[in-house]
Amino acid sequence: MARKTPIERYRNIGISAHIDAGKTTTTERILFYTGVNHKIGEVHDGAATMDWMEQEQERGITITSAATTTFWKGMSLQFPEHRFNIIDTPGHVDFTVEVERSMRVLDGAVMVYCAVGGVQPQSETVWRQATKYKVPRLAFVNKMDRQGANFFRVVEQMQTRLRANPIPVVVPIGAEDGFEGVVDLLKMKAIIWDEASQGMKFEYGDIPAGLESVAQEWREKMVEAAAEASEELMNKYLEEGELSEEEIIGGLRTRTLNCEIQPMLCGTAFKNKGVQRMLDAVIELLPSPIDVPPITGEEDGQPAIRPASDEAPFSALAFKLMNDPYVGQLTFFRAYSGVVSSGDTVLNSVKDKKERIGRIVQMHANDRKEIDEVRAGDIAAAIGLKDVTTGETLCAVDAPIILERMEFPEPVIHVAVEPKTKADQEKMGIALGRLAREDPSFRVRTDEESGQTIISGMGELHLEIIVDRMKREFGVEANVGAPQVAYRETITKTVTDVDGKHVKQSGGKGQYGHCVITLEPSGEGKGYQFFDEIKGGVIPREFIPSVDKGIQNTLNNGILAGFPVVDVTVRLTFGSYHDVDSSQIAFELAGSMAFKEAMRRASPVILEPMMAVEVETPEEYMGDVMGDLSRRRGIVQGMDDDGLGGKKVRAEVPLAEMFGYSTDLRSATQGRATYSMEFKHYSEAPRNVAEAVMAARK
């Protein structure tokens, strides 16, 4: 079957923004103008097409990136038909992993900013991710009709906060209630959209009288930016002082693809103005799959590349798993090279397992359309893959390749969950297993000490939504505990010649076990060590492992507060036995008694987990962030510039002090700082902390 749309007319784009910039509304308008939606879904009435999980419609925020395919021929039908694969990405900081994941499979992105709020914190995080993956991008300043809307302030914020190089290709006509349309700086004409047709129709007009000088000034900046794309263009511009429309678009395109500039547009998605011109800019200025470097990977341990061509062997990256109530698991994948048809067998090269692709569907938000094949550059979902996890490679069986893996952050918050009823127990295990497969930043484990199920994620909202999804999608009701800290106990000095004697000789078969031990600290991270130093057979060989076993049984229950004991060395130095009454159990008990007594004498202490915390913050909040970390008993270990005009602070902070940190950090920095943390090591808890912990366990 021949390709319907040539690959150079594909645009795989993400739409990315801070929570309230109006991204979902913008996506809705795109679907409307490109002819997919007949009735525009508004977010405020919970009808948006892309936000299809129930929680999203209730909360009015986007949690899962849905992928949608649509087509565009231009506002004036001036282009051949182009195919857009649009990935809608979440804007909440707890879902950053979703954004990171979609950045891997996009070729270009549209960053949506609010004309009032401007560049907000998550915009900075998303910008960093797009820079990391070298994603070319456009900026769309939305909500131009709102009180306080100011396009040029957003241009300035992009320069200062993001260190970006924004180049407006339109300027607004009016603002707030007076926002009427835009001046297209390429054509130097005003574009006014017709409200009666919901913006489907428009007309070009003359630039309003007071705007000519502003438009002229920004046009010159745009033409200069385009001229810098090549020596040829620069020479022509210097000689003639002007470039043709084709040359300007060509120059801007080259520099956008190299991530040197970010063309800017504006409008109001809600009032149906401006999105249409932005779609034209996606065709003119963002890359097709063949305009970006070919995907790289490993073939037999050697670096390999796969060009975006139907002739190359098939390779694809699974970037998202979703459960569909009707067809089961959907595996979203981006095909980088080759062709795959439904019914084909492919290789999951990460697990070295073959999988059969059952059916292939292309998604429009929550609707599915079955297709027969997927070609290089396309995005679709497969039904029927058994054992594929996010970030794994699917490829031709005879041409294995592992595409670069995605990196996911370690979860930073843990809570215990318990099913409300016995019936929920088994269902909860299945539900959590499925959710963990879908979302690599969410983990599940069983705590060996308490036997509880512990779930970990990227933030409090993340875990709330997981618990919510268990209830809605799997019908599992769960109680959620308060976040917990895993303390430990150890000793701080060496004690020698500690006796443990278990004697019971009052008629009948007696019991006799006697050992003498030395207990010493073994150093951080060394764990438990046992040395047999018995000489002259004072304890027979067969009883020595029993002493060790008795001590190990006691390790799980320290003498201060019942926490596990770590990093101790036991030397068995002396003892005695009875020919008839000695037994393995008697020596186990003797070992346990000796160890408990030795612990008491060896100055035991409580250890708490210390976390390596890294905070990225704009410079103006530096003082607040540092002050807050030291209030949390944190030790600042270094500071760097983050390359975006902000600072990176590295500190070591006890886990016990980090609960609620994401919320506190967000409010202290108006949400502009982000942080990550991971376990570093155990360290002795200060006396007041240890006393409080011990009191809480009594």
Curated annotation (Swiss-Prot):
**What are the entry keywords?**
Cytoplasm, Elongation factor, GTP-binding, Nucleotide-binding, Protein biosynthesis
**Tree of life domain:** Bacteria
Question: tr-type G domain location, by residue?
Answer: 8-290
Name the SMART domains for this protein.
EFG_C (SM00838), EFG_IV (SM00889)
A single GO molecular function term of this UniProt record? GTP binding
InterPro entries recorded: EFG_II, EFG_III, EFG_III/V, EFG_IV, EFG_V, EFG_V-like, EFTu-like_2, G_TR_CS
- Give any Gene Ontology cellular component: cytoplasm
- Provide the protein's localization: Cytoplasm
Gene3D superfamilies hit by this protein: 3.30.230.10, 3.30.70.240, Elongation Factor G (Translational Gtpase), domain 3, P-loop containing nucleotide triphosphate hydrolases, Translation factors
Gene Ontology biological process terms, A to Z = ribosome disassembly
- Using the record for this protein, list the coiled-coil segments as residue ranges, or answer none: none
UniProt main location, coarse: cytoplasm
List of residues binding GTP: 17-24, 88-92, 142-145
The family assignment reads:
Belongs to the TRAFAC class translation factor GTPase superfamily. Classic translation factor GTPase family. EF-G/EF-2 subfamily.
Q: What does this protein do?
A: Catalyzes the GTP-dependent ribosomal translocation step during translation elongation. During this step, the ribosome changes from the pre-translocational (PRE) to the post-translocational (POST) state as the newly formed A-site-bound peptidyl-tRNA and P-site-bound deacylated tRNA move to the P and E sites, respectively. Catalyzes the coordinated movement of the two tRNA molecules, the mRNA and conformational changes in the ribosome.
* UniProt protein name: Elongation factor G
Give the originating organism: Laribacter hongkongensis (strain HLHK9)
This protein's encoding gene? fusA
